[in-house]
Design a protein with these regions (language model features):
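Well-ordered secondary-structure scaffolds
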Residues: 2-267
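N-terminal glycine-rich phosphate-binding loop and ensuing alpha1 helix
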Residues: 4, 39, 268-320
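Conserved hydrophobic helix-helix packing surfaces used for dimerization/oligomerization
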Residues: 8, 270-272, 368
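Conserved alpha/beta core of the MobA/IspD/sugar-nucleotide pyrophosphorylase nucleotidyltransferase superfamily
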Residues: 268, 272, 418, 422-462
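Acidic helix N-cap motif at the loop->helix transition within catalytic regions
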Residues: 321-328
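Conserved donor nucleotide-binding strand/loop of the catalytic core
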Residues: 330-341
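Conserved beta-loop-beta/alpha segment of the NTase-like Rossmann-fold superfamily
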Residues: 340-419
Length: 462
């Protein structure tokens, strides 16, 4: 099956965001971008943010145009171009309903993006945690890891020191010397010498700190603050670098495209099933309602699934509270009124429903992930990594593990569906795992993630 065009919202329209747009647009996806009313993009000749104050911006073979509303944005996309809309809070999410959101604002902190904002969410640069704020993070720091996709954790923290280009780092920057309005004295593409006045800010001169070509400069008339980056100088002094997407932007765009392709190829091909019908015999009461860090265990388990809107999610339970919580989170509830028959019944009920739904939708499942409610330390990023591993290892069983200990979640390839449907009594998939050790792939996790709550005393270590 060929790739299907997805709707992708890029928050931010600066030069790096434009590099990301270039990769995604070239791959055939439908792109829309947001920005603030007065963009502060230094490399504005290669940034779609320029469309905000010029109405249109052409970068290489792409054209972006300012859209004032939904109707204009849709018309621009229909014509094959990229709409840029002034929408700092990205309220357009409500009507655009993107498949993917890329936060490329590059504020060095998260300004409000949530992992539940779209089926797949990517954070660009520091300030995001994969599995908490977004599904993955793309590294933006120059060097060996530039453009890497991070599925667990964060990008390298901002140091405040720009990367080395042509042997220069701090010297490359042109910074405002005072608060006030900027009046450029050099334009993008000009060759300048160290000590030359390149701008006036707040009536104070700004001097070049090195020889080279002005690669970026803010537009005239913008209000700036002292110390703000208003331009940059490139020692390589090549005119074409001023009007083409940078190597850094392309590398970051490549990382985003890798992540998007990974999601695109796996979405809808796996189902997630939460087993929540147990009797909690050893616990002495309903352990799924036990509170860990201010939240009932069943609630935190359901909330993990909310981060994976690209996959159909099921909750097998016979409990009213859990049913209501699951339905409000968009999960399909599969009723199990006979939990005394053991975990095998929940496995079979959930798997049967998932297979039926997939067949009805014409998208046969490649695998199913089973999770449980009593692992309060399980991270969303672990579920994501298990799905990724399963996609790249067809025919395998993939589970979380630490050292010699393996545990939930477990993702079963479709070739094991028949064996799972043959389970009986209070026997889960461990028997099948033992018989198919050669087919097992382990996703390493921290030991705390594997801890399950069986007895009340376990709560003290959770």
């Amino acid at each position: 099956m060929g790739s299907i065009e997805m709707k992708i919202l890029i928050k931010g329209a600066g030069d790096l965001a434009t590099g990301i747009a270039s990769r995604l647009y070239g791959a055939g996806h439908q792109i829309m971008m947001t920005d603030i009313a007065v963009p502060l993009t230094v490399r504005r000749l290669v940034a779609f943010s320029r469309a905000v104050y010029e109405g249109e911006a052409v970068v290489e073979d792409m054209t972006a145009r300012l859209a004032k509303n939904q109707e204009e944005a849709e018309e621009i996309m229909e014509q094959g171009d990229i709409p840029v809309i002034v929408d700092p809070k990205a309220e357009c999410i409500q009507w655009f309903q993107p498949d993917v959101i890329v936060d490329a604002i590059l504020a060095k902190r998260n300004l409000g993006t949530k992992i539940t904002d779209a089926p797949f969410v990517i954070g660009v640069g520091p300030g995001f945690i994969a599995g908490e704020d977004c599904n993955c993070v793309v590294e933006t720091k120059r060097g060996h890891t530039l453009g890497n996709v991070i599925w667990d954790g964060s990008a390298i923290p901002n140091t405040g020191v720009p990367g080395n280009v042509g042997g220069y780092s701090i010297e490359r920057l042109i910074k405002a010397s005072a608060d006030g309005v900027i009046e450029p004295k050099a334009v993008i593409g000009d060759l300048v010498r160290k000590g030359q006045i390149v701008a006036i800010t707040g009536g104070e001169p700004v001097y070049a700190l090195m020889d080279g070509i002005v690669r970026g400069m803010l537009q005239p008339g913008v209000q700036v603050t002292k110390g703000l980056k208003i331009g940059d100088i490139d020692a390589r002094a090549k005119q074409e670098h001023c009007r083409t997407i940078s190597d850094k932007a392309r590398a970051i765009g490549g990382g985003v495209l890798d992540a998007v392709c990974s999601y695109e190829k796996s979405r809808g091909k796996y189902a997630l099933i939460l087993l929540a019908a147990g009797q909690s015999v050893r616990f002495g009461s309903d352990k799924l309602k036990a509170v860990v860090e201010g939240e009932a265990m069943y609630e935190s388990a359901i909330s993990r699934f909310e981060a994976f809107q690209g996959f159909k999610s099921y909750v097998v339970t016979g409990k009213e509270e859990i049913t209501l919580s699951a339905e409000s989170a968009g999960c399909t509830v599969v009723c199990n009124k006979e939990p005394e028959k053991g975990i095998s019944l929940s496995v079979k009920l959930g798997l049967t429903k998932a297979i039926e739904d997939a067949d009805e939708n014409g998208t046969p499942l490649r695998g199913v992930l089973f999770s449980v409610c009593d692992q309060p330390r399980l991270k969303k990023s672990t579920i994501q990594r298990i799905i990724n591993t399963a996609f790249h290892n067809p025919g395998k069983i993939v589970c979380a593990g630490e050292g010699t200990r393996n545990g939930n979640p477990v993702l079963w390839d479709k070739r094991f569906f028949d064996k799972l449907l043959e389970l009986d009594g209070d026997i889960g998939g461990k028997k099948i795992l033992k018989e198919n050790v050669d087919s097992l792939k382990i996703v390493p996790v921290q030991a705390g993630e594997l801890q399950d709550i069986d007895r009340k005393e376990d709560l003290g270590t959770a």
